Amino acid sequence: MEYSYRTKINVLFIVLILFVFAALGTAINAPRRKLTKKYRGPCMAVNSIDKCWRCDPFWAEDRQKMADCALGFGINAMGGKYGPYYIVTDNSDDDVVDPKPGTLRFGVIQKGPLWITFARSMRIRLTRELIVSSNKTIDGRGKYVHIANGAGIKIQSASNVIISNLRIHNIVPTAGGLLRESDDHLGLRGADEGDAISIFNSHDIWIDHISMSRATDGLIDAVAGSTNITISNCHFTDHEKVMLFGANDHAEEDRGMKITLAYNHFGKRLDQRMPRCRFGFFHLVNNDYTHWERYAIGGSSGATIISQGNRFIAEDKLLVKEVTYREKSTSSVEEWMKWTWITDGDDFENGATFTPSGDQNLLSKIDHLNLIQPEPSSKVGLLTKFSGALSCKIRRPC
Protein backbone atom coordinates (compact mmCIF):
# COMPACT_ATOMS: atom_id res chain seq x y z
CA MET A 1 0.00 0.00 0.00
CA GLU A 2 1.34 3.43 -0.92
CA TYR A 3 0.78 6.45 1.30
CA SER A 4 0.11 9.94 -0.04
CA TYR A 5 2.65 12.68 0.37
CA ARG A 6 0.33 14.48 2.84
CA THR A 7 -0.01 11.33 4.96
CA LYS A 8 3.76 10.91 5.11
CA ILE A 9 4.19 14.53 6.18
CA ASN A 10 1.56 14.11 8.93
CA VAL A 11 3.27 10.97 10.24
CA LEU A 12 6.65 12.70 10.29
CA PHE A 13 5.11 15.67 12.11
CA ILE A 14 3.59 13.41 14.78
CA VAL A 15 6.89 11.57 15.25
CA LEU A 16 8.69 14.92 15.62
CA ILE A 17 6.19 16.12 18.23
CA LEU A 18 6.56 12.90 20.24
CA PHE A 19 10.34 13.22 20.08
CA VAL A 20 10.24 16.82 21.37
CA PHE A 21 7.94 15.92 24.28
CA ALA A 22 10.15 12.96 25.19
CA ALA A 23 13.22 15.19 25.15
CA LEU A 24 11.51 17.81 27.30
CA GLY A 25 10.41 15.18 29.79
CA THR A 26 13.96 13.88 30.05
CA ALA A 27 15.33 17.38 30.57
CA ILE A 28 12.76 18.25 33.23
CA ASN A 29 13.33 15.04 35.20
CA ALA A 30 17.09 14.86 34.68
CA PRO A 31 18.07 16.18 38.15
CA ARG A 32 15.88 13.56 39.87
CA ARG A 33 17.04 10.69 37.66
CA LYS A 34 20.70 11.46 38.24
CA LEU A 35 20.09 11.08 41.96
CA THR A 36 18.91 7.49 41.57
CA LYS A 37 21.76 6.31 39.35
CA LYS A 38 23.98 3.90 41.27
CA TYR A 39 27.64 4.91 41.44
CA ARG A 40 30.12 2.13 40.67
CA GLY A 41 33.39 4.05 40.50
CA PRO A 42 36.21 4.41 43.03
CA CYS A 43 35.55 5.64 46.57
CA MET A 44 34.71 9.35 46.79
CA ALA A 45 34.58 11.35 50.02
CA VAL A 46 32.60 14.34 48.85
CA ASN A 47 31.74 16.44 51.92
CA SER A 48 33.47 17.75 55.03
CA ILE A 49 32.21 14.99 57.31
CA ASP A 50 32.94 12.05 55.03
CA LYS A 51 36.43 13.35 54.21
CA CYS A 52 37.34 12.75 57.85
CA TRP A 53 37.15 8.94 57.61
CA ARG A 54 35.87 7.56 54.30
CA CYS A 55 38.03 6.05 51.54
CA ASP A 56 40.65 4.78 53.99
CA PRO A 57 40.94 1.02 53.28
CA PHE A 58 41.82 0.47 56.95
CA TRP A 59 38.78 2.28 58.37
CA ALA A 60 37.61 -0.87 60.17
CA GLU A 61 40.89 -1.14 62.10
CA ASP A 62 40.24 2.22 63.73
CA ARG A 63 36.46 2.53 63.81
CA GLN A 64 36.57 4.99 66.68
CA LYS A 65 38.25 7.60 64.49
CA MET A 66 34.73 8.36 63.33
CA ALA A 67 33.98 9.93 66.73
CA ASP A 68 36.18 12.87 65.73
CA CYS A 69 34.29 13.53 62.50
CA ALA A 70 31.01 15.16 63.54
CA LEU A 71 30.43 18.79 62.60
CA GLY A 72 27.68 21.26 63.39
CA PHE A 73 25.86 21.37 66.70
CA GLY A 74 26.55 17.67 67.37
CA ILE A 75 30.31 18.16 67.03
CA ASN A 76 30.98 17.01 70.61
CA ALA A 77 29.14 13.69 70.27
CA MET A 78 31.83 11.12 71.08
CA GLY A 79 29.60 8.08 71.34
CA GLY A 80 31.47 5.09 72.72
CA LYS A 81 34.94 6.48 72.06
CA TYR A 82 37.62 5.09 74.40
CA GLY A 83 35.29 2.28 75.41
CA PRO A 84 35.52 -1.42 74.50
CA TYR A 85 33.88 -2.95 71.44
CA TYR A 86 30.68 -4.94 71.76
CA ILE A 87 29.70 -7.20 68.86
CA VAL A 88 26.04 -7.98 68.17
CA THR A 89 25.88 -11.69 67.33
CA ASP A 90 22.17 -12.35 67.97
CA ASN A 91 19.43 -10.53 66.04
CA SER A 92 16.64 -11.64 68.40
CA ASP A 93 14.80 -9.30 70.77
CA ASP A 94 12.67 -11.78 72.70
CA ASP A 95 13.35 -10.63 76.25
CA VAL A 96 13.12 -6.90 76.99
CA VAL A 97 13.27 -7.39 80.77
CA ASP A 98 16.46 -9.46 80.85
CA PRO A 99 18.10 -9.09 77.41
CA LYS A 100 20.48 -11.80 76.28
CA PRO A 101 24.19 -11.03 75.90
CA GLY A 102 24.98 -10.73 72.21
CA THR A 103 21.77 -8.85 71.38
CA LEU A 104 21.65 -5.18 70.44
CA ARG A 105 19.38 -4.45 73.41
CA PHE A 106 21.90 -5.90 75.86
CA GLY A 107 24.62 -3.63 74.47
CA VAL A 108 22.79 -0.31 74.49
CA ILE A 109 21.75 -0.52 78.17
CA GLN A 110 25.23 -1.15 79.57
CA LYS A 111 26.92 1.51 81.68
CA GLY A 112 30.00 3.28 80.40
CA PRO A 113 31.18 3.91 76.84
CA LEU A 114 30.67 1.10 74.32
CA TRP A 115 31.29 0.90 70.58
CA ILE A 116 28.67 -1.48 69.16
CA THR A 117 29.28 -3.33 65.87
CA PHE A 118 27.67 -6.30 64.14
CA ALA A 119 29.09 -9.77 63.47
CA ARG A 120 27.12 -10.17 60.25
CA SER A 121 24.39 -8.56 58.20
CA MET A 122 21.07 -8.93 60.00
CA ARG A 123 17.48 -7.79 60.33
CA ILE A 124 16.35 -6.87 63.84
CA ARG A 125 12.68 -6.65 64.72
CA LEU A 126 12.47 -4.77 68.00
CA THR A 127 9.59 -5.98 70.15
CA ARG A 128 9.71 -2.76 72.24
CA GLU A 129 11.43 0.60 71.79
CA LEU A 130 15.21 0.34 72.10
CA ILE A 131 16.44 2.57 74.95
CA VAL A 132 19.98 3.78 74.16
CA SER A 133 22.02 4.96 77.14
CA SER A 134 24.82 7.54 77.21
CA ASN A 135 28.22 7.09 75.58
CA LYS A 136 27.16 4.58 72.95
CA THR A 137 27.92 4.20 69.26
CA ILE A 138 25.79 1.91 67.10
CA ASP A 139 28.06 1.35 64.10
CA GLY A 140 26.56 -0.64 61.22
CA ARG A 141 29.44 -0.06 58.79
CA GLY A 142 30.60 -3.16 56.97
CA LYS A 143 27.27 -4.97 57.30
CA TYR A 144 23.69 -4.56 56.10
CA VAL A 145 21.77 -3.95 59.32
CA HIS A 146 18.02 -3.38 59.18
CA ILE A 147 15.89 -2.20 62.10
CA ALA A 148 12.49 -3.03 60.65
CA ASN A 149 8.89 -4.14 61.20
CA GLY A 150 8.91 -3.42 64.92
CA ALA A 151 9.66 -0.65 67.40
CA GLY A 152 12.14 2.17 66.88
CA ILE A 153 15.11 3.66 68.74
CA LYS A 154 14.71 5.92 71.79
CA ILE A 155 17.51 8.15 73.10
CA GLN A 156 16.18 9.35 76.46
CA SER A 157 17.99 11.46 79.06
CA ALA A 158 21.27 10.51 77.43
CA SER A 159 24.33 12.20 75.96
CA ASN A 160 27.16 11.32 73.60
CA VAL A 161 25.31 8.97 71.26
CA ILE A 162 26.30 8.18 67.66
CA ILE A 163 24.08 6.12 65.34
CA SER A 164 25.63 5.27 61.98
CA ASN A 165 24.97 3.21 58.88
CA LEU A 166 21.65 1.55 59.64
CA ARG A 167 18.59 0.94 57.48
CA ILE A 168 15.52 1.80 59.56
CA HIS A 169 12.07 1.26 58.07
CA ASN A 170 8.52 0.03 58.64
CA ILE A 171 8.47 1.10 62.29
CA VAL A 172 5.22 0.49 64.18
CA PRO A 173 3.86 1.35 67.67
CA THR A 174 4.39 -1.24 70.38
CA ALA A 175 2.64 -1.82 73.69
CA GLY A 176 3.76 -0.59 77.08
CA GLY A 177 4.96 -2.66 80.02
CA LEU A 178 8.13 -3.52 81.91
CA LEU A 179 11.30 -2.69 80.02
CA ARG A 180 14.99 -2.85 80.94
CA GLU A 181 16.19 0.77 80.62
CA SER A 182 19.70 0.18 81.98
CA ASP A 183 21.61 -2.73 83.42
CA ASP A 184 20.41 -1.80 86.92
CA HIS A 185 16.99 -0.27 86.27
CA LEU A 186 13.71 -1.80 85.18
CA GLY A 187 10.99 0.68 84.21
CA LEU A 188 7.27 0.56 83.51
CA ARG A 189 6.70 2.36 80.23
CA GLY A 190 3.66 3.35 78.24
CA ALA A 191 3.08 2.46 74.62
CA ASP A 192 5.32 4.20 72.10
CA GLU A 193 4.04 6.12 69.07
CA GLY A 194 6.04 4.46 66.32
CA ASP A 195 8.90 6.93 65.80
CA ALA A 196 11.92 5.55 63.97
CA ILE A 197 14.35 7.57 66.12
CA SER A 198 13.08 9.57 69.09
CA ILE A 199 15.42 11.93 70.99
CA PHE A 200 14.04 12.96 74.39
CA ASN A 201 15.81 15.26 76.87
CA SER A 202 19.19 14.35 75.38
CA HIS A 203 22.22 16.21 74.06
CA ASP A 204 25.34 15.73 71.96
CA ILE A 205 23.78 13.35 69.45
CA TRP A 206 25.03 12.52 65.95
CA ILE A 207 22.95 10.56 63.40
CA ASP A 208 24.89 9.82 60.21
CA HIS A 209 24.41 7.76 57.03
CA ILE A 210 21.02 6.33 57.95
CA SER A 211 18.47 5.21 55.35
CA MET A 212 14.98 5.82 56.73
CA SER A 213 11.44 5.27 55.49
CA ARG A 214 7.92 4.35 56.59
CA ALA A 215 7.35 4.88 60.30
CA THR A 216 3.95 5.21 61.91
CA ASP A 217 4.80 8.59 63.45
CA GLY A 218 8.01 10.54 62.75
CA LEU A 219 11.27 9.39 61.22
CA ILE A 220 13.29 11.57 63.64
CA ASP A 221 11.76 13.52 66.55
CA ALA A 222 13.73 15.64 69.03
CA VAL A 223 11.82 17.02 72.02
CA ALA A 224 11.89 17.83 75.76
CA GLY A 225 14.95 20.06 75.82
CA SER A 226 17.10 17.99 73.49
CA THR A 227 19.94 19.95 71.88
CA ASN A 228 23.36 19.86 70.21
CA ILE A 229 22.31 17.42 67.50
CA THR A 230 23.69 16.81 64.01
CA ILE A 231 21.80 14.77 61.41
CA SER A 232 23.99 14.22 58.36
CA ASN A 233 24.33 12.12 55.21
CA CYS A 234 20.90 10.52 55.68
CA HIS A 235 18.42 9.50 53.00
CA PHE A 236 14.70 9.84 53.67
CA THR A 237 11.86 8.43 51.54
CA ASP A 238 8.25 7.22 51.74
CA HIS A 239 6.94 9.16 54.71
CA GLU A 240 4.45 11.87 55.63
CA LYS A 241 5.81 13.68 58.71
CA VAL A 242 9.57 13.38 58.45
CA MET A 243 11.06 15.34 61.39
CA LEU A 244 9.62 17.11 64.42
CA PHE A 245 11.90 19.38 66.47
CA GLY A 246 9.99 20.63 69.52
CA ALA A 247 6.95 18.81 70.90
CA ASN A 248 4.39 21.63 71.09
CA ASP A 249 4.00 25.41 71.28
CA HIS A 250 4.10 25.35 75.09
CA ALA A 251 7.38 23.41 75.45
CA GLU A 252 9.52 26.25 76.77
CA GLU A 253 12.36 23.81 77.47
CA ASP A 254 12.98 23.66 73.71
CA ARG A 255 14.06 27.31 73.48
CA GLY A 256 17.70 26.23 73.73
CA MET A 257 17.42 23.53 71.06
CA LYS A 258 20.17 23.63 68.40
CA ILE A 259 20.14 21.18 65.48
CA THR A 260 22.19 20.90 62.28
CA LEU A 261 20.92 19.16 59.14
CA ALA A 262 23.74 18.66 56.63
CA TYR A 263 24.25 16.71 53.40
CA ASN A 264 20.91 14.87 53.64
CA HIS A 265 18.72 13.84 50.72
CA PHE A 266 14.97 14.27 51.16
CA GLY A 267 13.79 11.93 48.44
CA LYS A 268 10.76 10.29 46.93
CA ARG A 269 7.24 10.24 48.35
CA LEU A 270 7.80 12.66 51.24
CA ASP A 271 5.05 15.03 52.32
CA GLN A 272 6.09 17.54 55.00
CA ARG A 273 8.25 18.33 58.08
CA MET A 274 11.77 18.38 56.65
CA PRO A 275 11.88 19.59 59.41
CA ARG A 276 9.03 21.16 61.42
CA CYS A 277 10.62 23.37 64.10
CA ARG A 278 9.67 25.15 67.31
CA PHE A 279 11.53 27.70 69.47
CA GLY A 280 15.17 26.72 68.79
CA PHE A 281 17.93 27.38 66.25
CA PHE A 282 18.12 25.18 63.17
CA HIS A 283 20.88 25.22 60.56
CA LEU A 284 20.04 23.51 57.27
CA VAL A 285 23.12 23.29 55.07
CA ASN A 286 23.78 21.64 51.69
CA ASN A 287 20.74 19.34 51.78
CA ASP A 288 18.95 18.14 48.67
CA TYR A 289 15.16 18.54 48.66
CA THR A 290 13.88 16.75 45.58
CA HIS A 291 10.34 15.89 46.69
CA TRP A 292 7.72 17.42 48.97
CA GLU A 293 3.95 17.75 48.87
CA ARG A 294 2.59 20.13 51.54
CA TYR A 295 5.84 21.90 52.40
CA ALA A 296 9.51 21.19 53.03
CA ILE A 297 10.43 23.43 55.98
CA GLY A 298 7.87 24.47 58.58
CA GLY A 299 7.73 25.94 62.03
CA SER A 300 6.12 28.05 64.73
CA SER A 301 6.82 29.56 68.16
CA GLY A 302 9.59 31.84 66.93
CA ALA A 303 11.88 29.14 65.57
CA THR A 304 15.06 30.46 63.90
CA ILE A 305 15.83 28.68 60.62
CA ILE A 306 18.96 29.31 58.55
CA SER A 307 18.89 27.64 55.13
CA GLN A 308 22.24 27.77 53.33
CA GLY A 309 23.42 26.16 50.12
CA ASN A 310 20.47 23.78 49.80
CA ARG A 311 18.81 22.67 46.58
CA PHE A 312 15.02 22.74 46.33
CA ILE A 313 13.41 21.07 43.31
CA ALA A 314 9.66 21.65 43.37
CA GLU A 315 7.16 19.13 42.08
CA ASP A 316 5.50 19.75 38.72
CA LYS A 317 2.22 20.47 40.55
CA LEU A 318 1.27 24.14 40.36
CA LEU A 319 0.36 24.51 44.05
CA VAL A 320 3.42 22.71 45.44
CA LYS A 321 6.13 25.31 44.94
CA GLU A 322 6.59 27.07 48.28
CA VAL A 323 9.29 25.57 50.51
CA THR A 324 8.19 27.12 53.81
CA TYR A 325 5.10 26.97 56.00
CA ARG A 326 4.36 28.92 59.19
CA GLU A 327 1.91 27.03 61.38
CA LYS A 328 -0.67 28.63 63.66
CA SER A 329 0.15 32.09 62.41
CA THR A 330 -2.15 32.66 59.45
CA SER A 331 -4.16 35.28 61.34
CA SER A 332 -1.12 37.36 62.24
CA VAL A 333 1.42 38.22 59.58
CA GLU A 334 2.99 40.58 62.11
CA GLU A 335 3.77 37.58 64.30
CA TRP A 336 5.60 35.34 61.84
CA MET A 337 7.40 38.23 60.17
CA LYS A 338 9.42 38.47 63.39
CA TRP A 339 10.64 34.87 63.10
CA THR A 340 14.08 34.76 61.50
CA TRP A 341 13.99 32.45 58.49
CA ILE A 342 16.87 33.06 56.10
CA THR A 343 17.68 31.64 52.69
CA ASP A 344 21.31 32.18 51.73
CA GLY A 345 22.83 30.76 48.57
CA ASP A 346 20.04 28.23 48.05
CA ASP A 347 19.17 26.89 44.60
CA PHE A 348 15.48 26.94 43.63
CA GLU A 349 14.44 24.83 40.65
CA ASN A 350 11.19 24.13 38.81
CA GLY A 351 9.51 27.19 40.34
CA ALA A 352 10.40 26.55 44.00
CA THR A 353 10.09 29.59 46.29
CA PHE A 354 11.17 30.44 49.86
CA THR A 355 9.51 33.17 51.94
CA PRO A 356 12.10 34.78 54.26
CA SER A 357 11.26 36.70 57.42
CA GLY A 358 12.80 38.30 60.49
CA ASP A 359 16.37 39.54 60.93
CA GLN A 360 18.07 39.03 57.58
CA ASN A 361 21.39 40.24 59.05
CA LEU A 362 21.58 37.48 61.67
CA LEU A 363 24.38 35.59 59.88
CA SER A 364 26.81 38.41 60.67
CA LYS A 365 26.09 38.02 64.40
CA ILE A 366 26.52 34.26 64.97
CA ASP A 367 30.17 33.51 64.17
CA HIS A 368 30.52 31.94 67.62
CA LEU A 369 28.15 29.07 66.82
CA ASN A 370 29.17 25.64 65.50
CA LEU A 371 27.93 26.22 61.97
CA ILE A 372 29.11 24.12 59.03
CA GLN A 373 30.39 26.40 56.29
CA PRO A 374 28.12 25.91 53.28
CA GLU A 375 29.49 24.94 49.91
CA PRO A 376 27.87 26.29 46.73
CA SER A 377 24.40 24.90 46.12
CA SER A 378 25.55 23.86 42.64
CA LYS A 379 27.52 21.08 44.38
CA VAL A 380 24.61 19.67 46.41
CA GLY A 381 24.02 16.75 44.06
CA LEU A 382 27.62 15.67 44.63
CA LEU A 383 27.68 16.47 48.37
CA THR A 384 24.66 14.22 48.97
CA LYS A 385 25.51 11.57 46.38
CA PHE A 386 26.31 8.96 49.02
CA SER A 387 23.58 9.82 51.52
CA GLY A 388 21.99 6.92 53.36
CA ALA A 389 23.56 3.70 54.61
CA LEU A 390 26.83 2.85 52.88
CA SER A 391 27.83 -0.51 51.43
CA CYS A 392 31.17 -0.73 53.21
CA LYS A 393 33.48 -3.74 53.05
CA ILE A 394 36.28 -4.60 55.44
CA ARG A 395 39.78 -3.77 54.15
CA ARG A 396 38.38 -1.75 51.28
CA PRO A 397 37.75 1.98 50.96
CA CYS A 398 34.24 2.73 52.20
Swiss-Prot record:
Residues binding Ca(2+): D192, D217, D221
Tissue specificity remark: Expressed in anthers and pollen.
Residues at the active site: R273
EC annotation from Swiss-Prot or TrEMBL: 4.2.2.2
InterPro entries, A to Z: AmbAllergen, Pec_lyase, Pectin_lyas_fold, Pectin_lyase_fold/virulence, PEL
SUPFAM superfamilies attached to this UniProt entry: Pectin lyase-like
Glycosylation sites recorded in the entry for this protein: N135, N228
GO molecular function: metal ion binding; pectate lyase activity
Domain of life: Eukaryota
Keywords: Calcium, Glycoprotein, Lyase, Metal-binding, Signal
Annotated pathway: Glycan metabolism; pectin degradation; 2-dehydro-3-deoxy-D-gluconate from pectin: step 2/5
Cofactor annotation comment: Binds 1 Ca(2+) ion. Required for its activity.
Reactions that this protein is recorded to catalyse: Eliminative cleavage of (1->4)-alpha-D-galacturonan to give oligosaccharides with 4-deoxy-alpha-D-galact-4-enuronosyl groups at their non-reducing ends
GO biological process: pectin catabolic process
Cofactor entry: Ca(2+)
Signal sequence extent: 1-27
Similarity annotation: Belongs to the polysaccharide lyase 1 family.
Function: Might be needed during pollen development and tube growth.
Name of the molecule in the record: Probable pectate lyase P56
Source organism (scientific name): Solanum lycopersicum (Tomato)
